[in-house]
Amino acid sequence: KTFFHSSSYTANPIACAAAGANLDLWDSEPVQDRIDAVAAVQAGGLARLQAHPNLSGARQIGTILAAEVGRTGSYMSTLGPDLMRFFAARNLLIRPLGNTVYLLPPYCSTVAELTACHDAMLEAADAFG
């Protein structure tokens, strides 16, 4: 069984304190500029993913990039653990859900780091697609 809301921190006091500190950063740091920069690099990665024959449904919303490895599969696909190990072997924390690979980078990510993630997603498509 999958715990579908594993990333929810609803009303957790520590998470609320972190959220407050995060809002303070928006006042003191160029956060929107960082978001725009990450989104632009992700757009370049999207074009690369869309061109790969073993990936389907490549898409981007803001800084989030996702694609399905292979042409068939679903959220409950057993490919997820294999993909997780594949990315971990490359020192990348990329969380697949079934055969869908999501890339949700922190806003401090560099071009080189994002490109390494895109490269790994393409390698995974070659290996598992």
Question: Predicted segments — roles?
Answer:
Residues 1-129:
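Conserved N-terminal phosphate-binding loop of PLP-dependent enzymes in the Aspartate aminotransferase
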